[in-house]
């Protein structure tokens, strides 16, 4: 039943009855339309060594903020943002994981439910690039083989201190089946939106055609806040990716 119809319905006795507070002043107050629910809920995980800028990338995308001296993530943190892409409204839950090995037993539980994985290294620190094979082993062991992969060389704003060339990043990504590559700067807000939106777009491309609208719409960011509900902790299930 339409709630507004109940406001105008007369009592059974035929009298007007008490005036509803909503009708005081002579006119009913128009109710706000509830926001359209999300068509999809997608989970994305950001991984990489300590200090590569995982938290900065997440916060730049979700809140458009940048912290010069962010504290290292302990275990797992997350943010939620709603985006519209390909005519669909997607509630994107982004998990920011700790880069220290002592947290691996905690963060590994988040891999299996992730539809997309962003692997980040610092272009100014060779050791973070050298750690990439270790992170790929984590992906092979815990992530779904259908998860979309994106390699990101972060801190492009520190170009003069670069230790890893763009060609090195591209070469690594080319060795992994289905992995995309790009460089970005959370500080300068360069390529940050593109990272997440391209990843979501690749995920949507894998979904059955009957759940997608035939017409494609431009990417529109929705900044409406979402309730922050702690993510679920699925049990890890070993799975090896075929490369």
UniProtKB/Swiss-Prot annotation:
It holds the Pfam family Ras. Regulated by guanine nucleotide exchange factors (GEFs) including DENND3 which promote the exchange of bound GDP for free GTP. Regulated by GTPase activating proteins (GAPs) which increase the GTP hydrolysis activity. Inhibited by GDP dissociation inhibitors (GDIs). A motif (Switch 2) lies at residues 96-113. Its cofactor is Mg(2+). The modification N-acetylmethionine is found at residue 1. Coiled coil: none annotated. Mg(2+) binds at residues 55, 73, 96. GO terms for biological process: autophagy; cellular response to type II interferon; endocytic recycling; endosome to lysosome transport; exocytosis; positive regulation of macroautophagy; protein catabolic process; protein transport. Interacts with RABIF and OPTN. Interacts with LRRK2; interaction facilitates phosphorylation of Ser-105. Interacts with GDI1, GDI2 and CHM; these interactions are disrupted by phosphorylation on Ser-105. Interacts with RILPL1 and RILPL2; these interactions are dependent on phosphorylation of Ser-105. This is Ras-related protein Rab-12. It comes from Rattus norvegicus.
